[in-house]
Every structure is written in structure tokens, then in C-alpha cells.
Swiss-Prot record:
Family: Belongs to the ABC transporter superfamily.
Predominant cellular place of this UniProt entry's protein: membrane
Protein name: Uncharacterized ABC transporter ATP-binding protein HI_0036
Species in which this protein is naturally found: Haemophilus influenzae (strain ATCC 51907 / DSM 11121 / KW20 / Rd)
Membrane topology term: Multi-pass membrane protein
Chain ranges of the ABC transporter domain: 391-592
Length: 592
């Protein structure tokens, strides 16, 4: 090797190899996407980001990362030649060549360290950019058309969407890049080191027949055989890792629920029940972990045995030629180094099978997330149209997720400013009707006409966002749209004047305010927004009858043009509404 020309030679080698790698890698991705299920899953989240129509930058960035990977391969090839020359100088007691090799080692080491640092930065930059893009895509898909709500009512419930967006996205991107660069590094190195080993390997006599370069065939046969066994041992890890993700997410969610419903659990003294449920879920996690551990012991144990054998395997083959003085110590050491590299590259697919198992589980969770959203969005046959003033139901039929009819062929017209009270037995479909109007319920068909862009829903347990009280009052709009004076005036109207001095305080208002106060805060929000239609789902259930009467009177005074549709059980609500819709058994209904 002419070290004086090595920089130019290496540059040419990297450019040529980069061109070949780009073509082969692209064709390989095409075949995977076309003919494998996991390839199609991979492309669901990579195709949009890597598309030149969106931006050419990701592809250029990836090519730069591949170029740095090839630079590392080239440095390792130069390092192999350095091994040979350094050990040969030791065998021949050539001090001049030895120190020359030490100087060369400094150059090789500096190049290797620099390449590693630059590669790390480029890879992390690429990963972060991809995570940002993919996170935005999935969050938008989850929030669009209220899919975050609809997916809760699918027959195959979408578990832990938070983990799929936050954790699985990062795992997918990082593993995709590491596997891609790993494959490129392994294949490129394998070809390069095979050429080197071909020149180093001597002939061997097998059953009386001399076979040239026998070591090359032996190492390939050895690795292929061990890889097949490793795949057989590691295959169950794919499903086990998927189950592990689900069990851990469910356990974590149960812990969060205890914090969320701490007061209710405390009132019921339900600690024993909750603790037993936690132990059951935790035991399931531990059991699955032990199954993974025992499977990994078999898989990793086999890999470790294979790795130990590979240390002495080339030595046993080449030592005869060394003792016969057919090769020098430098050649022997280079053979060991080249064999080790070639074995590692050939074993890449075997040793990373457990990583691929986790990767496949991540792909299944992410694609399951997207399929659930598509199913939730495509299921509804309800046609919801905008109407400037009125609320009109035409042949509206609603079912529960099991297919039982709750409401059949509902036909009602509510002119602007009308108030309607919906009553019926528990489970009759009162709240479900409101969900259908809002476009949240997929198990319905028919036609709804209403002011679709000017609605507000008040639930029994109002949503109070994080932040100060001013933000909670303005939600879902920005707090900058209302003045302090206006906010104080509205709080006084809903009998929450004692909170006026705390409008700018950031606290956990859900825990500070009673449920009745939260409901009055929701009424203040309703008066502030002045919607064309207001839907009240037992929005006064935590108020006494006097407060309830005051709140509805306030709505009539402040929002005379707003159509009010309420759900409630109290008989006192009847006098506060102009019409009643009674939901009866078997989908029947009656308007009073």
C-alpha cells in the first residue's frame, strides 16, 4: 500500500462505493417495500419524510451519513494493512519501520476519531429532524377529526397512544438509521474484507482434494450455519417484545389513573382493590420479562459461544502455514484481524436479530396506531352539514359499539334560540346523541344540519386546562382575546367573584375548584364565547337547584339567540326548556 497516495485512493474508493451503494440500497428498499409486510410498514413512516417532493435535504443528509460510514470502512481497511506492517517490523526487528508505523497509527487514529464524532453529529441531526417531522404527522393525524376520541370506542381499543407517539416514534427513527447504516457498513466491509482474506487464505486439502482459498469458504459456511440457528432461537423475541411494550404501558397507565382519581379512590377506601390490580399487571410484566430473559439467554449464549470460537478459528487454520514459514507474523496477525472483521460483518444480521425483533414490535404498534385512526374516521355514515341558524335531525339513527339501536330515525327541527331537554333512562343514548352531533360518534347514520363552526359543549366534568384561570376561562381560545375587566364581570355573573383576584395565578385548578365551581366556570366560558348552539351534558349536576335555575336564567338573558340542547335527569330542568325529547326503549323517541 502506497501511503503517500492513500488519501486520493481512498477518496476515489469512497465516491465509487457511495454511488454503487446508493443504487443497491435503493433497489433493496424497493424490494422490501414491494414484497415484505414490515417493509411496507417501514415505508409508511419513511416515505413522506424521504420524498424529494417534500424536501431533498433528508436524502442529501442520509447520503452524507453513508459517506461517513464508508470512510470508517476505508479507515478500517487501512488499519488492517497497518497491522500487517507493524507486526512484520516486530518479527524482523526493524525499529525504523516500527516507529514509522507508530506515526502512521497516529494519523489513522485521528482520522478514525474525527470520522466517528462527525458521524455521530450527522446521525443525531438526521434523527432529530426526522423525529420532529414524524411526531408532527402523527399528532396531527391523532388530533384531526377528533380521532383521539373516536379511537376509544373501537372494538379493538387503541391502547396507550401517548407511548406510541412519544416513545415508539423515537425508537423507530433511531433503530431505522442504526439498522440502515449497520447493513451498509456490514455489506461493504464484508465485500472488502473478503477480497483481503482471499489473498491471505492459502489452499487446504479436504478428502485428498486441494481447495484454494479454503478459509473464505469456511468462514462463510460457519457464519451462515450459526446465523440460521440464531434466527430460530431469536424469532419468538418479536412477539415477546411487542407484548412487553403493551404490558408496561398498561401498568404505567394504571399508575397514572390512581393519581388522576386519587380522591374518588380515597373516598371509597379502594386502596386494596387498586393495589391488587397493580400487582396483577406488574406480575404480568415480570412474567413476560422472565420469558424474554430465558429466551435471550439461549440467543445470547449461542452468540457468545460462536464469538469465542471465532477467536481461534482462523489461527488454527493459518498456524500451519506460519510454522512452515509460508507466511510472516504480520500476515498471520492481519489474517486474524481480517477474519475477525469479516466474521463480525457476516454476523451482523445474527447479532442484531434481537434489535430487529424490538424494531418489528415498534412498527406493529405505530402501524396499529395509524390503522385505528383510519378505521375510526372511516366508520361513520353520518352526514353533518352546516346550517347558519337551526339544528335539524333527518332520519338520524344511532347504535352502540355492539350494534344495538339507541335512537331510530330521529327527525326534529330546532329553530334558532330554542331550548331542548333530552331525557331518558341511563344508557338510552342521551350523551351519545350529543357526541353524534359533535362528530365524535362513529356508530350512526343519517343527516345533521347545524352551525358546525359555532358550537360549545359543556360536560358534567368540565375540562380545565393547565395554566392560569384566565386561560381556563378563555379556552379553547387565547386568553389575550379577553380583558381582565371582562373576565371579572363574567365571573361575578356566575357567582365566582371570589376568584377575580386569582385570574393570573397558575395552579392546578382542577384540584382547587370544586366540581360545582368548575361547572360554573364552564358557564362563564359559554357566556364569553356566545356560540350559536350550546350542548349541556348534565352540566349542572353538581349544583343545587337554586344555582341551576340561576345559570339557566343567565343563559336566557345573555344568550337569547343561542340554541340550548341539554341532557339531564332532574325534573326541575323541564321548566327551564321549551321542548323535551324523551328517549325510550328499542330506539323509540317522543317530543313533548
Amino acid at each position: 500500500m502506497d501511503y503517500s497516495q492513500e488519501a486520493i485512493t481512498s477518496l476515489i474508493w469512497i465516491l465509487q462505493t457511495l454511488a454503487i451503494t446508493s443504487v443497491v440500497f435503493s433497489f433493496g428498499i424497493f424490494l422490501l417495500v414491494r414484497f415484505t409486510q414490515w417493509g411496507k410498514q417501514f415505508w409508511m413512516f419513511a416515505g413522506g419524510y424521504l420524498s424529494p417532493k417534500r424536501s431533498i435535504k433528508p436524502i442529501l443528509f442520509f447520503l452524507l451519513i453513508v459517506a461517513m460510514t464508508l470512510l470508517s470502512v476505508r479507515i478500517s481497511l487501512v488499519n488492517s494493512e497497518w497491522y500487517k506492517n507493524m507486526y512484520t517490523s516486530l518479527q524482523e526487528f526493524n525499529e525504523h519501520v516500527f516507529w514509522q508505523q507508530m506515526g502512521l497509527f497516529c494519523v489513522i487514529a485521528a482520522s478514525s476519531v474525527s470520522a466517528a464524532l462527525v458521524s455521530y453529529y450527522l446521525e443525531q441531526r438526521f434523527v432529530i429532524n426526522w423525529i420532529e417531522w414524524l411526531n408532527e404527522q402523527l399528532v396531527n393525524k391523532w388530533m384531526a377529526h377528533r380521532a383521539y376520541y373516536k379511537t376509544q370506542y373501537l372494538s379493538e381499543n387503541l391502547d396507550n397512544p401517548d407511548q406510541r407517539i412519544q416513545q415508539d416514534v423515537q425508537s423507530y427513527v433511531k433503530t431505522t438509521l442504526s439498522l440502515s447504516t449497520g447493513v451498509i457498513d456490514a455489506v461493504t466491509s464484508m465485500i472488502s474484507y473478503t477480497i483481503l482474506l482471499w489473498g491471505l487464505a492459502g489452499p487446504m486439502i479436504v478428502l485428498g482434494v486441494e481447495i484454494p482459498h479454503m478459509m473464505v469458504f469456511l468462514v462463510f459456511g460457519y457464519v451462515i450455519f450459526t446465523t440460521l440457528i440464531a434466527f430460530w432461537l431469536g424469532r419468538p423475541l418479536i412477539s415477546l417484545n411487542f407484548i412487553n411494550e403493551r404490558l408496561n404501558a398498561n401498568y404505567r397507565y394504571s399508575l397514572i389513573r390512581i393519581k388522576e382519581y386519587a380522591e374518588s379512590i380515597a373516598f371509597y377506601a379502594g386502596e386494596k382493590v387498586e393495589k391488587n390490580q397493580l400487582y396483577q399487571q406488574f406480575n404480568a410484566v415480570i412474567h413476560n420479562m422472565w420469558v424474554i430473559i430465558f429466551r435471550t439467554l439461549k440467543f445470547s449464549g449461542f452468540n457468545l459461544v460462536v464469538s469465542q470460537i471465532s477467536v481461534v478459528f482462523p489461527l488454527l487454520i493459518q498456524v500451519g502455514r506460519y510454522f512452515e514459514k509460508q507466511i510472516k507474523l504480520g500476515d498471520l496477525m492481519q489474517t486474524l484481524q481480517v477474519f475477525g472483521q469479516l466474521h463480525a460483518n457476516l454476523s451482523f444480521f445474527r447479532s442484531t436479530y434481537d434489535n430487529f425483533a424490538s424494531y418489528k414490535a415498534t412498527l406493529d404498534r405505530l402501524t396499529g396506531f395509524c390503522y385505528a385512526i383510519e378505521k375510526a374516521n372511516n366508520k361513520s355514515q353520518t352526514q353533518i352539514h352546516n346550517h347558519p341558524t337551526d339544528v335539524i335531525f333527518k332520519n338520524l339513527s344511532i347504535q352502540n359499539p355492539l350494534g344495538h339501536t339507541l335512537i331510530k330515525h330521529l327527525n326534529i327541527t330546532l329553530p334558532q334560540g330554542t331550548s331542548l331537554l333530552i331525557q331518558g333512562k341511563s344508557g338510552a343514548g342521551k350523551t351519545t346523541l350529543l357526541r353524534t352531533i359533535a362528530g365524535l360518534w362513529s356508530y350512526a347514520e343519517g343527516e345533521i344540519n347545524c352551525p358546525t363552526h359555532n358550537q360549545l359543549f359543556l360536560s358534567q366534568k368540565p375540562y380545565v386546562p393547565q395554566g392560569n384561570l384566565m386561560s381556563a376561562l378563555a379556552y379553547p381560545n387565547n386568553a389575550d382575546n379577553i380583558s381582565h375587566t371582562q373576565a371579572v364581570e363574567i365571573l361575578n355573573k356566575v357567582q365566582l367573584g371570589h376568584l377575580a383576584e386569582q385570574l393570573e395565578k397558575e395552579q392546578d385548578w382542577t384540584r382547587i375548584l370544586s366540581l360545582g365551581e368548575q361547572q360554573r366556570l364552564a358557564f362563564a366560558r359559554l357566556i364569553l364565547h356566545k356560540p350559536a348552539v350550546a350542548f349541556l351534558d348534565e352540566a349542572t349536576a353538581s349544583m343545587d337547584e337554586g344555582l341551576e335555575f340561576s345559570m339557566y336564567q343567565l343563559l336566557q338573558q345573555e344568550l337569547p339567540q343561542t340554541t340550548i340542547i341539554s341532557v339531564g335527569h332532574r325534573s326541575t330542568l323541564k321548566t327551564l326548556h321549551q321542548q323535551q325529547l324523551i328517549l325510550q326503549d328499542k330506539g323509540q323517541w317522543q317530543v313533548l
